[in-house]
Amino acid sequence: MTDIIIQGIGGRMGHVLCEMIAQREDCRVVAGIDMKDGELNGIPVYDSLDKLDGKGDVVIDFSAPAAVEKALPYCEAHKLPIVVCTTGLSEELQLKIVQLSRSIPVFKSANMSMGINVLSELCKRASAILGANYDIEIVEQHHPNKLDAPSGTALMLADAINEENNGAYHYVYDRSAVRQKRDPKEIGISAVRGGSIVGDHEVLFCGPDEVITLRHTAYSRNIFANGAINAAVYLAKKEPGLYNMSNMIAEM
């Protein structure tokens, strides 16, 4: 039985995590971290990890960048593995996470969905086959409450394509102020915010006389919660290091 601490338990993903973990037999929620002390469906909630008093085998974080940064020293001091699901992290904070992984197990992915990670592999394969004759555009869509744009997932997809091509591409987020032809070595990334869109990512390979579209649509947050829970159970048994969805999928 894996004892899980949820940082951001009061948010949308926190509630979904609690509901899904309650249906499993291999893990349970022993505590939550949120803005103030309290209780959620019988689960003790604290405003700081420092109040945990040694509880838990692993942390699942769906919070905010500032909360992630505050959690890192505690996790390191208590050798507590952490699954970082929060996006919009600064380069400095991402570097701190990499450094932390030398001391404890850390799982980090911009998107915890199995399907998105399959999409990432398909994008890499498509870019390798199609080559430079196809322009690449990424369009991501989310609900209005999502703060970061473009999404971490859109950047993850762009990075996957770029790594497959030895870093040949640069990213363009806004063409409104640019009066010039499109650079063949750019990946355009556009963000849409509206309605109740959970998450939609579309990658277009635009070539001579044809367009190939690869797309993933999330219809509920359950897919992200399920991936995070599986990652937590997986990570609790690991040695220090930086892990991601590809590592976990490879060991299934």
Question: Which residues fall in each region the model found?
Answer:
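N-terminal Rossmann-like NAD(P) cofactor-binding module of classical short-chain dehydrogenase/reductase
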Residues: V59-I60
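C-terminal substrate-binding/catalytic lobe of Rossmann-fold NAD(P)-dependent oxidoreductases
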Residues: D3, Q7, R12-D50, G56, ...
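Rossmann-fold dehydrogenase core element
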Residues: P81, K96-S113, G131-I136
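Short glycine-/small-residue-rich Rossmann-like dinucleotide-binding loops
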Residues: S63-A64, T87, A191-R193
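Hydrophobic beta-strand scaffold residues
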Residues: V29, V45, I82-V83, V106-K108
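Rossmann-like NAD(P)H-binding beta-loop-alpha module
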Residues: V118-N133, A149
